[in-house]
Regions:
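Aromatic-lined carbohydrate-binding/catalytic grooves of carbohydrate-active enzymes
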Residues: 51-77, 93-96
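Short polar catalytic/cofactor-binding loops
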Residues: 19-25
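Glycan-recognition patch characteristic of GH18 chitinases/ENGases
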Residues: 18, 34-36, 42-44, 55, ...
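Active-site mouth loops of central-metabolism enzymes
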Residues: 26-39, 109-111
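A short acidic, helix-capping loop that chelates divalent metal ions and anchors anionic groups
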Residues: 25-27, 64-67, 101-105
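Catalytic domains of carbohydrate-active enzymes, especially glycoside hydrolases
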Residues: 39-61, 254-260
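Transmembrane beta-strand segments of Gram-negative outer membrane beta-barrel proteins
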Residues: 9-19
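Active-site region of glycoside hydrolase catalytic domains
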Residues: 2-11, 78-322, 332-431, 435-440
Length: 440
């Protein structure tokens, strides 16, 4: 059963938003709590609707809904899900947006991780059978890389073997959680969002690494999709770093094919690799005026993966002119590739409100606001709120609230969402590559 009102949007393009929702309970980090969305979810969801977004990426927090093995607490989810359904907004539900419960041990490096994720998926699908769209795992490649290879996030491991181990577990979690959902809702649809990047080598030594990274960006989608056979360019690399042939065979026999590929793309998503003074590889963001650009990356991802594309995360941290320039550029490039027949079916500004402490990679508490949203966050001392204020102050336990302040970028966004897609992103040209392809 779909929410009332869903289906009124144009069938081949949607404007979307969401709320940054990463959690790392091992260090007490919870972005929805830092931004106070966990308290003010109702007014935030109404702001998303007012911004013209009838489809929204919305996450649950695994450690909150599943506080102990096989124990469930849906009190933080029931209200938002009920409101979304009442408003006729369609959620694409993030079941695992980084962060596993403390009781889950080593998380993505644990052999039982896929089973735990499947339990979560089944429990959610049983409770909310009307939900149709799912993201079982947000950025599974990034989760594997940051948790298993670079040590940036829990479980803080390093090296290619731990990366491949995490990759296998996370990809299997996608497959098993998706199978669990489809048992309960056979017509459910899946969108996995992951990094949309490109590496440019500036010297000969960097060329090999750039080539590897430009192959690796497709790796997670192709692994859980059962597409890695003997002729895959990274098959030998995977086996050399611990992937068993039996693992690859399992994925080919139990694929989780996507309905939509989610592209997470920002101004810093193209890289320049060069050799530093001590022989180390240096990775920096490529200047915008030298980038291939979103249109070319869409062509590459569609040619490789052959599925409809959605900008599942995008935005430009900074002031309003920076955000508006990025949005205008992205819309122009989406119009270009849709005119070529590349099925780009949505843009998601991430997130609707500013973030807190994302500048630290959510590794340290500084309570610093990162200017990423269409609504700016500003600290207010609620103790001095005028008693006659028309709206009650949204306060936290310390007497402070984060006020949501509309920006000029929001007004630009709303002009796009209010207009016909034919006049903004243009019609999707028919082609042999998208013929008969299910979009929304």
């Amino acid at each position: 059963v779909s929410p009332p009102g869903v289906g009124a949007e144009p069938i081949d393009f949607r404007w979307m938003t969401g709320f940054e929702c990463s959690t790392f309970p091992q260090i007490g980090m919870d972005e929805l709590a830092l931004t106070q969305h966990d308290r003010f979810w109702g007014s935030d969801i109404l702001r998303a609707l007012d911004a013209g977004c009838r489809t929204i990426r919305y996450a649950i927090r695994w450690h909150v809904v599943n506080p102990a093995p096989q124990a469930w607490d849906w009190s933080s989810v029931d209200g938002p899900m009920e409101l979304l359904r009442h408003l006729g907004m369609e959620p694409i539900v993030d079941l695992f947006h980084f962060g596993v419960p403390v009781w889950a041990g080593t998380g993505v490096l644990s052999s039982i991780f896929p089973d735990l994720q499947a339990e979560l998926a089944a429990a959610f699908a049983r409770r909310y059978p009307w939900v149709r769209w799912y993201t079982p795992t947000n950025e599974p490649y990034i989760m594997s890389q940051f948790g298993g290879e670079t040590g940036a996030w829990y479980p803080y491991e390093h090296g290619p073997r731990n990366f491949v181990r995490a990759l296998r577990n996370v990809a299997r979690g996608v497959c098993e959680s998706w199978a669990a959902i489809r048992e309960i809702r056979p017509d459910a649809r899946m969108m996995i969002s992951d990094t949309c990047e490109y590496w440019h080598a500036l010297d000969e030594r960097a060329e090999q690494r750039a080539a590897l990274m430009n192959e690796r960006r497709f790796l997670m989608h192709e692994l859980h999709g059962g597409r890695i056979g003997d002729d895959h360019p990274l098959r030998d690399w995977l086996v050399r770093h611990g992937m068993e042939e039996a693992d690859l065979a399992w994925f080919r026999e139990n694929p989780a094919e996507l309905d939509v590929i989610g592209l997470d793309h920002y101004p810093h998503s193209e890289h320049e690799l060069s050799t530093g003074p001590r022989g180390e590889l240096v990775d920096v963001a490529r200047p915008l005026d030298r980038q291939l650009g979103p249109a070319e990356l869409c062509r590459q991802y569609f040619a490789r993966l052959g599925r409809p594309l959605l900008f599942a995360e995008t935005g430009a941290p900074g002031d309003d002119p920076t955000k508006i320039a990025w949005l205008d550029r992205l819309v122009d490039e989406v119009r270009t590739v849709r005119g070529e027949g590349v099925p780009v079916i949505g843009i998601t500004w991430w997130g609707l409100i500013d973030q807190v402490d994302w500048g630290t990679g959510l590794r340290r508490f500084r309570y610093e606001i990162d200017p990423t949203g269409l609504y700016a966050l500003e600290w207010r001392d609620a103790r001095y709120e005028p008693a006659e204020a028309p709206d009650p102050p949204e306060v936290d336990g310390r007497g402070y609230r984060l006020e949501r302040v509309p920006t000029a970028a929001l007004e630009t966004w709303k002009r796009y969402t209010a207009a016909s897609p034919e006049t903004t992103v243009g019609p999707l040209a028919s082609s042999s590559t998208n013929e008969g392809m299910a979009l929304w």
